[in-house]
């Protein structure tokens, strides 16, 4: 039996999992990754600490399995997109990594919006503007930390950095870097005109070569092996953007299925074989790890992170108890609304979170119910836009932590009016990365591995009409917030 290691570096956790050649999970370990936020809007990560935590979870997952490190045939890494990790001329971390949820480039993005720069770069990159894009972060550093900017030797993203720590080889992986605004989507390569447009021309030479998801980037070094418990010489592949990894594990094959991810971010994805230039909505495209395919997705950090914050602030019991109590409430019966914008907004740049409609008879459970509803209402803006691009989509395959909550999934089915399928896969990031490792080591048919059971949720027509009324109240609430500042 052959075994494969999949590493998943997300917004709050890093995980390492071992799978056999059939995609069966053998062992998994995880650690929380601290986010450093010393100033309002900052979201940073200590790069040395990140690698140390990665090495620890690799060690732990090997140790708690019955598998020898020599039996691991290849390694893949999945990680969150955007953000920026910098190395100096000695290939040492140059300060902290800046994550995709960082908002320090707010004024720069706001200025670009006023200049209508989107009209110039969107036809090339098929990306929109975001504060956490590498180009936005780099422009901020150029203007505010010029000395650090001059010392940047290499620009990476999260899994590129971890891959470098394992192999000492420098690459940018295609599915992730294709959504950086440095990448010409139509030509499939970096474009210096983009760097010039964003005022960071110098950066184009600091981007390493691009590598595909299932191609071998390098081999585990003796130093990395000693730190992680691996053995020297194991192949490490390019890996995946975590949104792509999840879509891959959702086994999207046609325009009738969409993938919804609920985690730190709410993401709606679809897979297509062509760029549709007739659309008026600026859909975000990215490279997909299958020949001549693109992923299209809508996303914002308006998801379960809001619930996690509330639970931590008020030291609430476990999520099963919360689900049980919410299930006792009548759907859409409360007047309480929640804008899930603690970490960013999909309605207006800089819009913040908040409750509205609280009355004296409401309890903490009503607030939690409003958070559940608010996350789905916010998700609907992405889902409705994606249905414009994928009008035949009738089924949503849902992954992420909230997919374990039956009350939350039924709420999504009732609000959207769509059939839900919940794949019996808990670790899509790790599995997707491992699948790329399998492809590099042998010819593997991914669809056979992903031929798994799915739990079904069907919409309740009666609840749908009730939720529509509250959803329209939510939209009015968000519109009012837009005009507040």
UniProtKB/Swiss-Prot annotation:
It is an enzyme of class 2 (transferase). Belongs to the FGGY kinase family. Pfam families: FGGY_C, FGGY_N. This is Probable L-xylulose kinase. It comes from the Bacteria. Homodimer. Its EC number is 2.7.1.53. Keywords: ATP-binding, Kinase, Nucleotide-binding, Transferase. PROSITE patterns: FGGY_KINASES_2. GO terms for molecular function: ATP binding; L-xylulokinase activity; phosphotransferase activity, alcohol group as acceptor. It catalyses: L-xylulose + ATP = L-xylulose 5-phosphate + ADP + H(+). The keyword ATP-binding applies. InterPro entries: ATPase_NBD, Carb_kinase_FGGY, Carb_kinase_FGGY_CS, FGGY_C, FGGY_Carb_Kinase, FGGY_N. The keyword Nucleotide-binding applies.
């Amino acid at each position: 039996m052959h075994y494969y290691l999949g590493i998943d570096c997300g917004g709050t956790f890093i995980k390492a999992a071992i799978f056999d050649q059939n995609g069966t999970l053998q062992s998994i370990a995880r650690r929380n990754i601290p986010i450093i936020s010393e100033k309002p809007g900052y979201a940073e990560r200590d790069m040395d600490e990140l690698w140390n935590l990665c090495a620890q979870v690799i060690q732990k997952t090997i140790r708690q399995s019955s598998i020898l490190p020599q039996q691991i045939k290849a390694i893949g890494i999945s990680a969150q997109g955007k953000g920026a990790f910098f190395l100096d001329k000695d290939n040492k971390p140059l300060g902290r990594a800046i994550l995709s949820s960082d908002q320090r480039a707010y004024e720069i993005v706001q200025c670009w919006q006023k200049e209508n720069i989107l009209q110039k770069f969107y036809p090339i990159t098929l990306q929109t503007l975001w504060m956490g894009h590498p180009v936005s972060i780099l422009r901020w550093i150029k203007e505010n930390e010029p000395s650090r900017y001059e010392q940047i030797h290499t620009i990476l993203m999260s899994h590129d950095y971890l891959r470098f720590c394992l192999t000492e080889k420098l690459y940018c992986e295609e599915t992730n870097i294709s959504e950086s605004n440095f990448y010409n989507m139509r030509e499939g390569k970096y474009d210096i005109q983009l760097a010039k447009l964003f005022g960071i021309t110098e950066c184009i030479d600091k981007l390493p070569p691009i590598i595909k998801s299932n191609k071998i980037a390098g081999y585990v070094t003796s130093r990395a092996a000693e730190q992680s418990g691996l053995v020297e010489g194991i192949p490490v592949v390019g890996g995946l953007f975590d949104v792509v990894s999840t879509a891959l594990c959702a086994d999207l094959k046609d325009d009738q299925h969409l993938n919804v991810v609920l985690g730190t971010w709410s993401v709606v994805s679809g897979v297509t074989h062509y760029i549709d230039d007739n659309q008026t909505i600026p859909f975000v495209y990215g490279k997909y790890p299958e020949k001549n395919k693109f992923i299209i997705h809508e996303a914002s950090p308006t998801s379960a992170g809001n619930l996690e914050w509330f639970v931590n602030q008020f030291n609430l019991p476990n999520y099963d108890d919360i689900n049980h109590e919410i299930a006792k409430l009548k759907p859409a019966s409360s007047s309480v609304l929640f804008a899930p914008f603690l970490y960013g907004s999909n309605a207006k740049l800089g819009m913040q979170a908040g409750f509205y409609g609280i009355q004296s008879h409401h309890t903490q459970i009503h607030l939690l119910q409003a958070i559940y509803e608010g996350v789905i209402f916010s998700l609907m803006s992405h889902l409705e836009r994606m249905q414009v691009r994928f009008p035949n989509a009738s089924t949503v395959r849902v992954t992420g932590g909230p997919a374990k909550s039956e009350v939350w999934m039924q709420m999504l089915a009732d609000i959207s009016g769509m059939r839900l399928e919940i794949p019996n896969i808990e670790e899509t990031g790790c599995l997707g990365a491992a699948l790329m490792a399998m492809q590099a080591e042998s010819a593997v048919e991914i669809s056979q591995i992903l031929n798994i059971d799915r739990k079904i949720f069907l919409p309740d027509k009666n609840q749908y009409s009730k939720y529509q009324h509250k959803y329209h109240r939510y939209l009015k609430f968000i519109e009012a917030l837009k005009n507040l500042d």
